[in-house]
């Protein structure tokens, strides 16, 4: 069997597994967020934090809850790292420097999981399990809560109430993320991932000498790392490490975990909004982009040029032999079209066009299917933009799900789509203009520029993957990427919740013969076109200086 056929079979199996899980998981999440029942453990949590889960919140109160909880999470994780040397289970590692601690705290709370440190050489068991892994659950639950608040904005009328942030946070964690993660961890242990709290071992090597190996609660952290589209690895090699991702079966399962909730949330959206066809339209747009990018990546990396590529069966530099080009390409596209950022190969070693695909996947806004929660609300923002453009073409006031898209709503949507490009291009320009940041580039020319562009694209889009040629463990990059991660995560949430509040206050508009049907394939095509055109106009000049120039030169 050729590698290409094997890759096609892997992709087919993945699509089948996602299709089987789509309906039951999507409906289950809709029931979770619509339920008025509170389980006893949830009541204990509400009592501990002093929250009333039955109290409805308008968007400013919902936003205050998101920001206050996230700010406390950043502070807690920062302090935990700063005192690591005094904590039990630190494995002898010292406390983390202030700029590194800030960067890591911002990274994990913002669901980015950018790592400019070596996990197995810097973080002990307590920080890994009690700090980083906990934030993997909580940051994902925050994203899901904001997405559900926007869905309620479409579903509700003549009210400004969007639900209760604390109830959404707890339910998303306790009823969705924890149960699936437990199952996922068991599967990964069965596949060969490690799960223990052992210390550092001296292991002999075949070529002579010794090597230090860490134990750790890897399988449990790996499960939520992928399920919550977090991406931060227990080891520096991330999912290329055999302790995290031992074989092709575990590799495909991890990709399944990455895509599971983002795709299923479109079913949740359709169910809560009262029209499953609307969810299918969003799903269709996501699926077209994801499958298209995956096919393009596999074609790019399998393309042979010269005897070395023919012998290797494609561009194998930076890829694990146990995954091959197909397994690496499927993983790379899934991790950059979502906010995961986990890697099982090194994106910096991909072909020029292959690296450009990973960059473009993030620059789309990670909406196909995007991060847990953030993918859905990002796609719904683009859906509003597409409806607005269609309305301009036919001279009608645009509507979406029975809600008028007026000046106020378009301003919120426009601010949302401008924030991330401004952060990415602004920080990249400053870093290239100053002498010190450029010293961190391992490569010069187009690839060196791509390293800088990739770093800020990854940070501002809350992805967390990197072109490994960049030395990001400097005060400049730790600070500026940390700021980009926080602003790129929470500023868009401000406009999402403000938009949700404005929609919830409206009275539904009855559908007429002139209303644009947003539950048809034609609209899905319009949505895909809108996304690609806006992204192209925004980022093409930067991409032309980096991956496109490198790809054409090679």
From Swiss-Prot:
Keywords: Cell membrane, Ion transport, Membrane, Potassium, Potassium transport, Transmembrane, Transmembrane helix, Transport. One of its GO terms (molecular function) is P-type potassium transmembrane transporter activity. The system is composed of three essential subunits: KdpA, KdpB and KdpC. The keyword Transport applies. Part of the high-affinity ATP-driven potassium transport (or Kdp) system, which catalyzes the hydrolysis of ATP coupled with the electrogenic transport of potassium into the cytoplasm. This subunit binds the extracellular potassium ions and delivers the ions to the membrane domain of KdpB through an intramembrane tunnel. It is a multi-pass membrane protein. Signal peptide: none annotated. Its main location: membrane. Coiled coil: none annotated. The chain crosses the membrane at residues 1-21, 59-79, 131-151, 174-194, 246-266, 279-299, 323-343, 352-372, 375-395, 412-432, 481-501, 525-545. InterPro entries: KdpA. It comes from the Bacteria. This is Potassium-transporting ATPase potassium-binding subunit. Belongs to the KdpA family. It is found in: Cell membrane. It holds the Pfam family KdpA. PANTHER family: POTASSIUM-TRANSPORTING ATPASE A CHAIN, POTASSIUM-TRANSPORTING ATPASE POTASSIUM-BINDING SUBUNIT. One of its GO terms (cellular component) is plasma membrane.
């Amino acid at each position: 069997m050729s590698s290409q056929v094997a890759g096609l079979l892997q992709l087919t199996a993945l699509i089948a597994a996602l299709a089987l899980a789509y309906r039951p998981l999507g409906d289950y999440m809709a029931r979770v967020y619509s339920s008025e029942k509170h389980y006893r453990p949830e009541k204990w949590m509400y009592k501990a934090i002093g929250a009333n889960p039955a109290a409805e919140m308008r968007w400013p109160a919902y936003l205050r809850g998101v920001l206050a909880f996230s700010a406390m999470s950043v502070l807690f994780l920062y302090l935990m790292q700063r005192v690591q040397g005094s904590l039990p289970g630190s494995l002898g590692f010292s406390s983390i420097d202030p700029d590194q601690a800030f960067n890591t705290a911002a990274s994990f709370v913002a669901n980015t999981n950018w790592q400019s440190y070596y996990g197995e050489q810097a973080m002990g068991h307590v920080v890994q399990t009690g700090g980083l892994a906990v934030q993997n659950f909580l940051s994902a639950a925050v994203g899901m809560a904001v997405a559900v608040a926007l869905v309620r904005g479409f579903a509700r009328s003549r009210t400004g109430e969007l639900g209760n942030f604390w109830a959404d946070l707890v339910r998303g964690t306790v009823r969705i993320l924890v149960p699936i993660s437990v199952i996922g961890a068991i599967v990964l242990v069965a596949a060969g991932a490690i799960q223990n709290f052992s210390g550092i071992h001296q292991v002999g090597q075949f070529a002579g000498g010794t090597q230090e190996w860490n134990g750790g609660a890897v399988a449990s952290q790996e499960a939520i790392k992928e399920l919550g589209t977090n991406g931060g690895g227990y080891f520096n090699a991330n999912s290329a490490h055999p302790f995290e991702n031992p074989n092709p079966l575990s590799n495909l399962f991890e990709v399944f975990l990455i895509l599971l909730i983002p795709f299923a949330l479109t079913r949740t959206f359709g169910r809560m909004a009262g029209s499953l066809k609307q969810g299918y339209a969003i799903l269709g747009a996501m699926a077209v982009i994801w499958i298209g990018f995956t096919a393009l990546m596999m074609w790019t990396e399998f393309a042979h040029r010269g005897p070395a590529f023919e012998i290797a069966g494609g561009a194998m530099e930076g890829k694990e032999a146990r995954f091959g080009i197909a397994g690496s390409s499927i993983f790379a596209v899934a991790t950059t079209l979502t906010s995961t950022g986990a890697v099982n190969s090194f994106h910096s070693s991909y072909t020029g066009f292959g690296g450009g695909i990973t960059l473009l996947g993030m620059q789309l806004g990670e909406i196909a299917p995007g991060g847990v929660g953030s993918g859905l609300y990002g796609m719904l923002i683009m859906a509003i933009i597409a409806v607005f453009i269609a309305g301009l073409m036919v001279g009608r006031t645009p509507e979406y799900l029975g809600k008028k898209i007026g000046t106020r709503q378009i301003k919120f949507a426009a601010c949302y789509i401008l924030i991330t490009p401004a952060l990415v291009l602004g920080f990249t320009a400053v870093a290239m203009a100053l002498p010190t940041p450029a010293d961190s580039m391992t490569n010069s020319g187009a690839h060196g520029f791509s390293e800088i562009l990739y770093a800020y694209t990854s940070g501002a889009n809350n992805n967390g993957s990197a072109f490994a040629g960049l030395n990001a463990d400097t005060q400049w990059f730790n600070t500026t990427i940390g700021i980009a991660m926080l602003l790129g995560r929470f500023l868009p949430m401000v406009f999402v919740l403000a938009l949700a509040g404005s929609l919830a206050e409206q009275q539904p508009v009855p559908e007429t013969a002139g209303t644009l049907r947003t539950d048809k394939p034609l609209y899905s095509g319009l949505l895909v076109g809108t996304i690609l055109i806006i992204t192209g106009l925004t980022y093409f000049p930067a991409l032309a200086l980096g991956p496109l120039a490198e790809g054409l030169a090679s």
